[in-house]
């Protein structure tokens, strides 16, 4: 018996077959790409794809700071979607995350015909440039053996105190005794500017910035005691150790297979995750001078590791961006020569 289908049923079956074939082709391409990728790199990419919860907004911030800023700080939304799609971030999630970043005044929109560019706001660019100075630094800060203090000299409401604590935490300040925010090398002027940018200008009249030197009295507490009182370095050390454990195999494979060219897409995706993971660590790191840190501090190894992996991935990842990075008008802006200055003075990790 011959079975016949209505026109609508035939269209539905044809569409289903096309979707099935498309998915089969996509899986085949992904499997073929996986065969061409170095195993530790593939593992890192797969680990990210298998996460149940992905903070897409935070990842997009990392992409803007690392890849978009050197090309003028703007990108067509469709291009951003294509760049992040291989990490299995769907279009809806990316659009929603970018919209939220615009509401938070990190980004703004600029239409061009039927397309839209997203670009950094002046305040967003200022925050990115400040973060870049920390992320791509070649060494730990030097210390003049003086402490920077911000002392509260007026009454603060509980909500004001918590907002102040959070804002200064992201600037690297620790807390001593509730009313003293301390750091060995922070820029006090920049810290006050950051408070203004966070909408806390009304608190400045209740804060006293100070520079303090060690009076060196006999059995008094020393600088290391100050560090232990102001920061929880044990937790941070564990996070750095996890970073090293995650990316050390990647570096070893890149070193061992220097004759094998990593493909541009994998280089870009790994570079993005590398900087994303490292940036999130630095947000929690007060960036203390080496002299104040414990011996064999894992943050030092993590910095050298990040530097070398990044420099090895840079050429292939930039070639990938040359291909997929577009503005709404169809142009592909060139990367700034300053990109090559990132981690410029990095010594190889022994």
For the regions a protein language model found, what residue spans apply to each?
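Short alpha-helical segments that sit at the start of domains
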Residues: 37-63
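Short acidic, hydrophobic short linear motifs in intrinsically disordered regions
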Residues: 71-83
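Short, hydrophobic-biased segments on the C-terminal half of alpha helices
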Residues: 95-99, 116, 165
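Glycine-centered, phosphate/nucleic-acid-interacting loop/turn motifs that mediate DNA/RNA or nucleotide
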Residues: 105
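Short, Lys/Arg-rich nucleic-acid/phosphate-binding segment
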Residues: 111-117
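Amphipathic alpha-helical dimerization/coiled-coil segments
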Residues: 133-176
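C-terminal regulatory/effector modules of DNA-binding transcriptional regulators
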Residues: 221-350
